[in-house]
A protein has these predicted regions:
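Extreme N-terminal tail/first-helix region
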Residues: 1-11
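C-terminal edge-of-domain segments
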Residues: 88-156
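Short beta-strand segments
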Residues: 10-48, 78-79
């Protein structure tokens, strides 16, 4: 992933994680933040186990994953896809990344009148409920509304 994509997805964005069942029924969960590894290959999304239970079940069966990132104030959006994902516990660096993501998102949505407390209530995770969803994206798409929506973006 290039520096622009990384800066965007690790910034103040809304994150939606999606997958599907064996019957092709969609599953969706909100991500609370993300972190890209030093090699720019792997992405870890931070989620609530309870809220993402169906997504986790689908991913555990080997279903593909799509993650959409969108900045509320500008509607800039992009989507990353991978044929499968792995589940993990959050590492110490993940917690600081989660805090940075939530703080940046709070600054963005404050322009729409939402408080930092609102963001912490919606996106906050506790250690027992938190889970990491790891993916190695092989496709990226521009999803910002307009003439370039759906365009492929370079992943590597």
């Amino acid at each position: 992933m290039n520096a622009d994509i990384i800066a965007f997805i690790e910034g103040g964005v809304s994150i939606v994680v999606s997958s599907r069942s064996e019957a092709l029924e969609p599953s969706v969960a909100r991500g609370s933040g993300c972190r890209v590894d030093a090699e720019r290959q792997r992405l870890r999304i931070f989620c609530s186990r309870r809220a993402a239970a169906q997504v986790i079940a689908d991913l555990s069966r080997g279903a593909p994953i799509a993650v959409t990132f969108s900045r509320p104030t500008t509607h800039r959006s992009l989507q990353l896809k991978a044929p499968r994902a792995a589940l993990s516990t959050l590492e110490p660096d993940d917690w600081s990344a989660l805090e940075r993501c939530c703080d940046a998102f709070a600054l963005d949505v404050a322009q729409h009148g939402h408080s930092a407390q609102f963001v912490k209530t919606v996106l906050g995770l506790d250690a027992e409920d938190a889970i990491g969803i790891e993916l190695w994206p092989d496709e990226a798409f521009e999803q910002t509304p307009g003439r370039h929506a759906g365009d492929h973006l370079p992943v590597r």
